[in-house]
Amino acid sequence: MSNKLTFQEIILTLQQYWNDQGCMLMQAYDNEKGAGTMSPYTFLRAIGPEPWNAAYVEPSRRPADGRYGENPNRLYQHHQFQVVMKPSPSNIQELYLQSLERLGIDPLEHDIRFVEDNWENPSTGSAGLGWEVWLDGMEITQFTYFQQVGGLATSPVTAEVTYGLERLASYIQEVDSVYDIEWAPGVKYGEIFLQPEYEHSKYSFEVSNQDMLLENFEIFEKEAERALAQGLVHPAYDYVLKCSHTFNLLDARGAVSVTERAGYIARIRHLARSVAKTFVAERKKLGFPLLDDASRVALLAED
């Protein structure tokens, strides 16, 4: 195993590669979320006219997927490596395949397939054309061209590449269980994450206080609305993320019915859309500072 990339070396390799392609290297956003797409570095920056190229690792929590550390491939928390490029480069798929080569995976020697899988996130009002990337029969990446984010049409189109780091590392290191992945020399994934995985699963399915979570959802929703009323986009979005994670905990606990579930998702979606619209308005007031001068003048002159 010593001659194979460790988990952290995979991250470092991807960071260096996408840095070379002009991406800013961001840090994981400090709020619970179910996917890297929900980070403000993707959700907010994918809308509006300004360019944005970023890459970051995002720990992603999905309470309903917890399995007490007993399932070798299904986790309460996993890690995504997220790349967002706006406008989408015409050669984004080629860039992706080159990133696999950097990891020691030669596309000419492996069965790499792009399987159509259009993406939708009802709770944030987001959707796009998408493909799963399968490497020798195992999904390792999700490719998406955003068409709508927060209920707003995207222009220009943002390309998102989401690597599933645990799956990628399992393949590279040739192990059957994520807990056998070598995170760093001499340190296994399970030695870091197995106990937290068990504890979070037990909490999500058995211990969480449903009444408290229901109350928290109401509080977070009202606080998001209050922040938005003051034009405070980023604090409001933090509370949208808190609403989303709280709902996921309630869902894992079986505390919401099918009908109630749709209602909660609609409430989160309403907040996310309000945040998206307010964010674009905020950037416009600032004069879309990330645009080049000619584009900014032309765009603002249209209004």
From Swiss-Prot:
UniProt lists the family membership as follows: Belongs to the class-II aminoacyl-tRNA synthetase family.
PROSITE patterns in the record? AA_TRNA_LIGASE_II_GLYAB (PS50861)
Gene3D superfamilies on file:
Bira Bifunctional Protein, Domain 2, Class II aaRS and biotin synthetases, domain 2
Gene symbol of the encoding locus: glyQ
Q: Which GO terms describe its molecular function?
A: ATP binding; catalytic activity, acting on a protein; glycine-tRNA ligase activity; transferase activity
Q: Could you tell me the Gene Ontology terms of the biological process aspect for this record?
A: glycyl-tRNA aminoacylation
Primary subcellular site in the record, as a coarse category: cytoplasm
Q: How does it assemble?
A: Tetramer of two alpha and two beta subunits.
State the organism of origin: Streptococcus equi subsp. equi (strain 4047)
Keywords assigned: Aminoacyl-tRNA synthetase, ATP-binding, Cytoplasm, Ligase, Nucleotide-binding, Protein biosynthesis
InterPro entries associated with the record: aa-tRNA-synth_II/BPL/LPL, Gly-tRNA-synth_heterodimer, Gly-tRNA_ligase_asu
Catalytic reactions of this protein: tRNA(Gly) + glycine + ATP = glycyl-tRNA(Gly) + AMP + diphosphate
State the Pfam families in the record. Answer: tRNA-synt_2e
Please name the PANTHER family in this protein's record: GLYCINE--TRNA LIGASE, CHLOROPLASTIC_MITOCHONDRIAL 2, GLYCYL-TRNA SYNTHETASE
Where's it found, cell-wise?
A: Cytoplasm
GO CC field: cytosol
Q: Is-annotated flag, keyword Membrane?
A: no
Q: Which domain of life is it from?
A: Bacteria
What Enzyme Commission number(s) appear in the record? Answer: 6.1.1.14
Q: What is this protein called?
A: Glycine--tRNA ligase alpha subunit
